[in-house]
Amino acid sequence: MATSLGSNTYNRQNWEDADFPILCQTCLGENPYIRMTKEKYGKECKICARPFTVFRWCPGVRMRFKKTEVCQTCSKLKNVCQTCLLDLEYGLPIQVRDTGVSLKDEMPRSDVNKEYYTQNMEREIANSDGTRPVGALGKATSSSDMLLKLARTTPYYKRNRPHICSFWVKGECKRGEECPYRHEKPTDPDDPLADQNIKDRFYGINDPVADKLLKRASTMPRLDPPEDKSITTLYVGGLGDTISESELRNHFYQFGEIRTITVVQRQQCAFIQFATRQSAETAAEKSFNKLIVNGRRLNVKWGRSQAARGKEREHDGSGDPGMKFEPVPGLPGALPPPPTEEESSANYFNLPPNGSAALVNISLPPPPGLSGPPPGFGPHMFPPMAPPPFLRAPGHIHYPSQDPQRMGAHAGKPSSG
C-alpha cells in the first residue's frame, strides 16, 4: 500500500488536499496582507512521504520565502506548525513539550506501519471535532509548570530572515545591497545548533534546540517566600497599558481572598495583598515565571516590608541622612552661621530696635585727599575708623537678603505726634 508521490497512483484517495495551511504566527509574519500560492500534491511529506498540498508565501519585507514541509495529518498528530514544527500552543520544540507533559513518543518508523498508523489517525481526526489533538497527545496532561515558564508568548520574526550568502562568505558576491541573502558571518560548524534535522525535530530525539531549552529549565531561578510571615503582598510588574485591575483580580482570586489591589500606572506595576499568608504563597508558587495575561508575560515577586526597605537603604547608603561625604574640591567654604541673639530672633534685616536706618559695615575706598603710601612703604599706620555707635549694626551681614539698602527696604520714619 504505497502512498508516496513516486509510486503508483492507485491509492490517491490518501493524498492530502487542503485549502489553508496550519501555521504559527511567526511563520505567517507580521504583515496581515500576504499573497500565498497553493500547489496541489506539490511535494511529499517529509515525515510520512505522502503527497500533500504545498503552500508558499513571503512573511514580510527582506524575508525569505517559506513553504509547508509536512502534511496536515502529521501536523495535527503533534499539534505543531507545518513549517517550523514547533508546538502551536507554547512555541517550543516537540521534545521539550513531550518532556513537560511526560509523554513518550510511540509513532512507528517503518514504512508499512507508518502508513497504517497514519490512516488510523486520519480516521480518528475525521471523527473528532478538530479542536483537540488526537493520539497520545490528546490523553496527556494539558499543562505543565515548566512549559509555562519556557513558553514563547510573542512571535520571533527574526527566524524568517534570509539564509547567509555563500558567495559573500567566499568573497565572491557581486550583488552588493541587492543580494537577497544575508551578508553575515556564519555560525561555528562545531556549534550543535548548526546541525538540525526535521525528522529529529518531529520525533523529539537529538534536537539541539530542545537540549538547550531543557538545560535552561534546569537552571531557572525559584521564588522563595520571605522569612517575615507578616508579608502577604505580591509585586506584579510589566503590566503595560492594557492590563487592568479587574484582569488581575480575575487571575488571583482563585488562590484566596484578596484584601487590596493597587495598580501604579506610571511604573506599570501592581501590588496585590492577600488576606492570609497561605494564599499569597500559593499565588506566588503558581504564578512565578508563568503568568501570562493578554499575551504579556508578567513578573511576579514578593513585596517587601518597610523595615526591609530601610535596611536596604542603610546598606546602600542612600537612606542615611547623617552620612558624611568627601567635600567637592574647588567649591567655596561654608558661610558662618547667623548671630544667635534672643532679641533679634525676628529681625531678619538686622535693623536696630529704635527703627532708624542701619548702615552696613562695608569697606569703603580711602578719601580723595589721602593717597596711597609711596613705593617701598607699608600701609598707613593708623587703625581703621569705625562707624559711630548709633549707626553700628547689631550684627554682621552674611547674605544679600540681609542688606536693607540693596533690597529697597527702608525703616519708616518715627511719627512726630
Swiss-Prot record:
Biased composition (Pro residues): 369-391
Alphabetical list of CDD domains matching this protein: RRM_RBM22
GO cellular component, one term: cytoplasm
Gene Ontology terms describing biological process: mRNA cis splicing, via spliceosome; positive regulation of RNA splicing
UniProt xrefs under Gene3D superfamilies: 3.30.70.330, Zinc finger, CCCH-type
GO molecular function, one term: U6 snRNA binding
SUPFAM superfamilies for this protein: CCCH zinc finger, RNA-binding domain, RBD
Zn finger region (C3H1-type): 159-186
Alphabetized UniProt keyword annotations: Cytoplasm, Developmental protein, Metal-binding, mRNA processing, mRNA splicing, Nucleus, RNA-binding, Spliceosome, Zinc, Zinc-finger
Domain RRM: 232-305
Composition bias type Basic and acidic residues, residue spans: 309-318
Highest taxon of the lineage: Eukaryota
Intracellular or extracellular location(s): Nucleus; Cytoplasm
Region (Disordered): 303-348, 369-417
Complex and partners: Component of the pre-catalytic and catalytic spliceosome complexes. Component of the postcatalytic spliceosome P complex.
Protein family according to the UniProt entry: Belongs to the SLT11 family.
Description of its domains: The C-terminal RRM domain and the zinc finger motif are necessary for RNA-binding.
Role description: Required for pre-mRNA splicing as component of the activated spliceosome. Involved in the first step of pre-mRNA splicing. Binds directly to the internal stem-loop (ISL) domain of the U6 snRNA and to the pre-mRNA intron near the 5' splice site during the activation and catalytic phases of the spliceosome cycle.
Protein name: Pre-mRNA-splicing factor RBM22
Lineage: Eukaryota, Metazoa, Chordata, Craniata, Vertebrata
